[in-house]
Amino acid sequence: MRVVTFAVLIMSLSAVSVAQDTRPVRQSAPRWPDGTINLGAPPGQTGMWDGGEPLTTIPNNYEKVGGRPRPGLVHLDQIPIQPWARALLDARHARFLADEPYTRCKPSPAARAFQTAYGIELLNLPGTGRIYLFQTGGAHSFRVIYMDGRSHPRDVQPTNFGHSIGWWDGDTLVIDTAGFNEGFWMDRDGLPHTSQLHTIERFTRTDFSSIRYELTVDDPGAYTSAFGGQMNLRWEAGTELFEYQCQQMNYANELMVGQFEKVDRSSFIIP
């Protein structure tokens, strides 16, 4: 009887072992020959990063968080926002975010770049002194991050993407950006900012399929102190950025082809 019991136990453990062996192996982050983390697809492969997560959660908005918020998600009440900026934020939500620049095909930096349905690509090539971040769409938006040790210019011309310099902190890419204009929203929920905005972004490819994105916002024109949050980017293997019709002031494709006479803003979906 003991022999039978022991045999059954061995078979059971073997079955568990086989089941465990068939589980997908977690791949480590790819690296270039010099040891630098590759933030994109390995040579000969394709893929892009998909975000979509909110950086903040705002009471009574279209992205309610059920249950316990994930780590890194910042509640609006925890953001040290100035009264005028909070009033502007409330006004944007009263208009159902209808004035958001990104939905009018304007480029957007910081967290907003990762809160779309279309993905982004990160390209870092050792020896070039540059890292590029590409966004999909007809606007052909991309950022250049200078990795050659330079500083920000004293009189930088304000732009949507600002002026970005970067460096490696171990396996984490750190990007310091200043010189923003006020023509964009830095996240999908409409957080205001001023030309004093200064951001620090940290990209950590924790494994082949994941990047932890951390953002620190410092804008004394709109907030009483610096604050930050984080989100996760997911790797979509075998995919590439694609073209779609997107021009400034193009409110709807239907208007261009004459099927409708007005824009329907009743949908909760924000591109």
Q: At which residue positions do the language-model features occur?
A:
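N-terminal signal peptide c-region/cleavage motif recognized by signal peptidases
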Residues: 14-16
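PEST-like low-complexity, intrinsically disordered acidic/proline/serine-rich tracts
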Residues: 18-271
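Positively charged n-region of N-terminal signal peptides that target proteins for export
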Residues: 1-4
